[in-house]
Amino acid sequence: MISDETFAKQERLIKTKDFRKVYKDGRSYRAGFIILRLLPNAALMNRVGFSISAQSIKRAFRRNRIKRLFREAYRRNKNILRKGFDIVFVVRRDFKENFSYAEAQQVFLNLSKQAGILL
């Protein structure tokens, strides 16, 4: 049996109004330099977005790398998360440069457990 480890378009938070709603009405959980914002939705799947300001991390290639790491951590672990949430990962200014995938996955799992969405 092949597991579904894709990151489909329907799973992405893209619209500004969706991000604003999660910021306004969602709950926050923090682990170091990452904040997870969580809001229940009416869908049968999770939708995920990433927020990294250019003011906090100046170089685009660094911002993109961080997003890739957390996108991969979500993609590989989404089957062990409860469904029906809009999730936004916010990266703060004190992010360290040499961050690995293993560290991203550990932070992702810790935040998911803290938020109560880990099965």
Describe the role of every protein-language-model region.
Residues 1-119:
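Positively charged, solvent-exposed patches that mediate nucleic-acid binding
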